[in-house]
A protein has these predicted regions:
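Mixed-charge, low-complexity segments
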Residues: 1, 12, 17, 23-32, ...
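Short beta-strand scaffold segments in enzyme catalytic cores
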Residues: 5-8
Length: 172
């Protein structure tokens, strides 16, 4: 099943992929499709390998190539994206159900929130990770670390505490 969407753009006769929705390892620049050469971005180097009609996007992390996902160029109907999005946002087996996941990039850094903790990755430095102990810490991180205005809601603290208590804090 297809649950992810890339944009294919042709600029000056050269095809590029653009991906703005892959979370923590999202490429932070368009990537040329028709080369297997290593491509620099403001963050990690990436490469796209091709095997027949199948492409694989990889990122170099700590000197190792890491497979992110595979894709092809088969056109997708809008309804296919609707069904895929519905599945990942509602099916009990979806890795996104019951989760709070946030990612943000900036010059030379990536910040992610998930699994009850925060990770900060800076280019050329060791990653930093820390747990979020309670709902107040999660809300403060969303506001200060990610620039998200968190609206007041009577059930918000309880929902975050339930998420933290469900095992979300097992790893950062």
């Amino acid at each position: 099943a297809r649950t992810h969407l890339l944009v294919l753009a042709t600029v000056d006769g050269e095809r590029h992929i653009v991906d703005v929705g892959f979370g923590g390892m999202v490429p932070t620049a368009p990537l040329r499709l028709d080369t297997e050469a290593v491509q620099s971005t403001p963050h990690e180097p990436y490469r796209i390998t091709r095997h027949g009609d199948q492409y694989t996007l990889q990122a170099q992390v700590a000197g190792q190539w890491r497979r992110l996902y595979a894709f092809d160029l088969q056109p997708q109907a809008e309804i296919d994206q609707v069904v895929g999005n519905w599945y990942v946002s509602t099916h009990p087996d979806s890795p996104f159900m019951g989760q709070l996941r946030v990612a943000r990039t900036g010059p030379g850094w990536r910040r992610t929130l998930g699994s009850g903790g925060v990770a900060l990755h800076r280019t050329g430095l060791a990653s930093e990770r820390w747990p979020l102990a309670d709902a107040d810490a999660v809300i403060a991180e969303l506001q200060q670390g990610f620039g998200i205005r968190v609206p007041a809601h009577p059930g918000l603290h309880a929902a975050i505490e339930a998420w933290l208590g469900s095992g979300a804090s097992s790893s950062a």
